[in-house]
Amino acid sequence: MAHFPGFGQSLLYGYPVYVFGDCVQGDWCPISGGLCSARLHRHALLATCPEHQITDPIDGRVIGSALQFLIPRLPSFPTQRTSKTLKVLTPPTTHTTPNIPPSFFQAVRQHSPFRNGCMEPTLGQQLPSLSFPDPGLRPQNLYTLWGSSVVCMYLYQLSPPITWPLLPQVIFCHPGQLGAFLTNVPYKRMEELLYKIFLNTGALIILPEGCLPTTLFQPIRAPATLTAWQNGLLPFQSTLTTPGLIWTFSDGTPMISGPCPKDGQPSLVLQSSSFIFHKFQTKAYHPSVLLSHGLIQYSSFHSLHLPFEEYTNIPISLLFNKREADDTDYGPRIPPGGLEPPSEKHFHETEV
């Protein structure tokens, strides 16, 4: 399900980007307005980022580093390739597979809305079958239930490519629910399982307050954040640099961030509004800020609900101006005749 290297189109802004291969994990890059993964030493930066410009070894275009994977990319188109460049530009595979007991998957199938080997959430769209492939391949996502919400645990990189800004660097997990699937497993073993997941992924793990009675799995050992959950929503936390993975619509309908269901289809749906794009026109806002304020939402379905009229006329200077890319404050600049910003009640912060 790999996407060939080539030129594509930005999912959000519509500008051309260069795609080297499968997308990878990353963080928000305020300089370029793209994504950057320092841990993996791979970058997802715009071709116009002044600090990361190099020449494409194939056709001489200015694109970025040879280890860069530009996100977003939708769609991607083939370009001239050689076996040498493909070897350099294709990301490595994951060489290990997590050891998850079969009873977990059996219980998920029993307690989840599985139909024909796929999960069917309330929005009526199918997600890939829950499974882990053979070692040497990238496992797909792991889905479970918490309350009335479907919870997705990203254990490894996605097998299909992902799109901006959905990042498998935050694991949103409820150990009690996980323990319900694993019979006769004490909490200490749950903590050890989570800690092993952290060691294999390097992900930040978000746990509900008071979920573990012991102190084995604490921030001193791994970057675990204990915080209150509100109907599956991850509250805003200034310490988080990536958005959480599980969100719900305003009416409480769960949304699941997952891989694209079919080859060539987007894994990200950005539900837009005019105010969101006024914010994007003025500042490269961090996606977690927009998420926490309820301004953007995610799901993993077939269509992209993004009216093109809302961003086709955005001046390029607003996207790449250094001052506008500075995300040190969250106060939007409303252009003349633009929409008013939301009231302060939309900007709640939750202390951890």
From Swiss-Prot:
Q: Where is this region: Interaction with CREBBP/P300?
A: 80-94
Chain segments carrying region Interaction with CREBBP C-terminus? 311-318
This entry's Gene Ontology molecular function terms read: DNA binding; SH3 domain binding; zinc ion binding
User: What positions does the record give for the motif labelled Nuclear export signal?
Assistant: 187-201
Motif PDZ-binding, per the record, lies over 349-352
Q: How does it assemble?
A: Homodimer. Interacts with host CREB1. Interacts with host DLG1, IKBKG, KDM4A, MAGII3 and TAX1BP1. Recruits the coactivators CREBBP, EP300 and PCAF. Interaction with human CARM1 enhances Tax transactivation and promotes methylation of histone H3. Interacts with host SUV39H1 protein, leading to abrogate Tax transactivation of HTLV-1 LTR. Interaction with human CREB coactivators, CRTC1/TORC1, CRTC2/TORC2 and CRTC3/TORC3 enhances Tax transactivation. Interacts with host UPF1; this interaction inhibits the host nonsense-mediated mRNA decay (NMD).
What is the protein's name according to its record?
Protein Tax-1
Gene behind this protein: tax
